[in-house]
């Protein structure tokens, strides 16, 4: 495990470049800062300033090296590196509420933006007019879209929203792609077609994720439940009520293992039993260390006042919090190995810190941990 504290401000979202040498983060304001690794240090190399509202989503396309951002100003920008400068292109989303999340499609020929306008904007580039245009997926979304994830086929899109539902839509754009092949989710996929809708969640759906194979979708809700639907099992949904505080992010690290994190400030493992069709709690991945009793320096005390709004010595030192992150984990991303066989993943949190977790090291450190 490697932990780096970038700043006192919370990290509201992040994205990595292709070779994992640079990370783009939002320091909880209208800017995006890009840091580059140099030895053991992270140096700020770029600042992207175009939004006039808080940035709520960042995604970095690995092949085209383009960054897409969205924010509470109801806009999205596609950033292209020209020389040593990132140049923004405005994308009109045609929404009247804040944009909340953004994700590039796997083929990088379109991206999706979820918003408070109860729509998902599917944006693609029109060569004839030399600009980005968007189509809206509207029905039957009844509240803010908080999370998105693409199916590997570049067409299906999973969305979690504040109406307590996880849904899968077709985001097929005939202008930029060929007709998709049938999937376990269905064979007819016109734009906006609802392929699946959950009925088991009882809270805002904070995070959603497709498996590497694309036949499973997992999501986490504000009622502290984790759910997984398997299209190859007649859309059977497995639900587990966890004992943690609400989870905010989730990702597959193998076809049967998932990592999630949220307000408890540490990542946890969940395992799916394919034969039984059930989810189980696999354990906490952040091993608590015995804290040595020591006094706080003035600098540490003021930093912790900012991070945790706490002046109590125990809470400030982390005696009350024995996790690596000292505040809620807001995002998880797979660093290497992909969702099929992840070897490293990254978490960023409201404490302004970023952690890199090595799966093999976690398995050896935690004797009872079995990642299948």
Swiss-Prot record:
Component of the Arp2/3 complex, a multiprotein complex that mediates actin polymerization upon stimulation by nucleation-promoting factor (NPF). The Arp2/3 complex mediates the formation of branched actin networks in the cytoplasm, providing the force for cell motility. In addition to its role in the cytoplasmic cytoskeleton, the Arp2/3 complex also promotes actin polymerization in the nucleus, thereby regulating gene transcription and repair of damaged DNA. Belongs to the WD repeat ARPC1 family. One of its GO terms (biological process) is response to estradiol. GO terms for cellular component: Arp2/3 protein complex; cytoplasm; nucleus; tubulobulbar complex. Its main location: cytoplasm. Signal peptide: none annotated. It holds the Pfam family WD40. It is found in: Cytoplasm, Cytoskeleton; Nucleus. This is Actin-related protein 2/3 complex subunit 1B. One of its GO terms (molecular function) is actin filament binding. InterPro entries: ARPC1, WD40/YVTN_repeat-like_dom_sf, WD40_repeat_dom_sf, WD40_rpt. Keywords: Actin-binding, Cytoplasm, Cytoskeleton, Nucleus, Repeat, WD repeat. Component of the Arp2/3 complex composed of ACTR2/ARP2, ACTR3/ARP3, ARPC1B/p41-ARC, ARPC2/p34-ARC, ARPC3/p21-ARC, ARPC4/p20-ARC and ARPC5/p16-ARC. Coiled coil: none annotated. It comes from Rattus norvegicus. WD repeats lie at residues 6-45, 50-89, 94-135, 140-179, 242-280, 324-367.
